[in-house]
Amino acid sequence: MTDWTALIRDVPDYPKPGILFKDITPLLADHAAFTQVVDELGDGLTFDKVVGIEARGFILAAPVAYRSGAGFVPVRKKGKLPADTYEASYDLEYGSATIEVHADAFDPGDRVLIVDDVLATGGTARAAVELVRRTGAEVVAASFLMELSFLSGRDRLPGLDVRTLLTV
């Protein structure tokens, strides 16, 4: 595995004071690094569909699905999908948020890989796992570009194969 930390820019006080934002756009702009990340996120796994969590998860999940010959399924913020959906809510630092997936996005027994850019508190990932399972599909793993280990998000995903390419 390659260390891509030099291609991830720290942006202090974004989007609000006290937050150190991890900007992955320099990594995405580097063809070799982006290709390696896409290859490694799904490496060694067998799956039928790849879930990408809005918004940066889309950037990573769609090429993983393409490279693997799998389908891509977007998990979006509430109100952004046009057909019947399942929804799951999760807590944020102040308040809560809701994500949705189309009710017909998976066939029962589909093997699903969840992909996102960052594993932080684990709330969003846990809600995505709940959505997939509600459809009758099986989550085989969740893969993230980076994990903010000090937030212990992995602890909110017990029994799940959690993979991260970088830990900060």
PLM region spans:
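PRPP-associated nucleotide enzymes
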Residues: 1-168
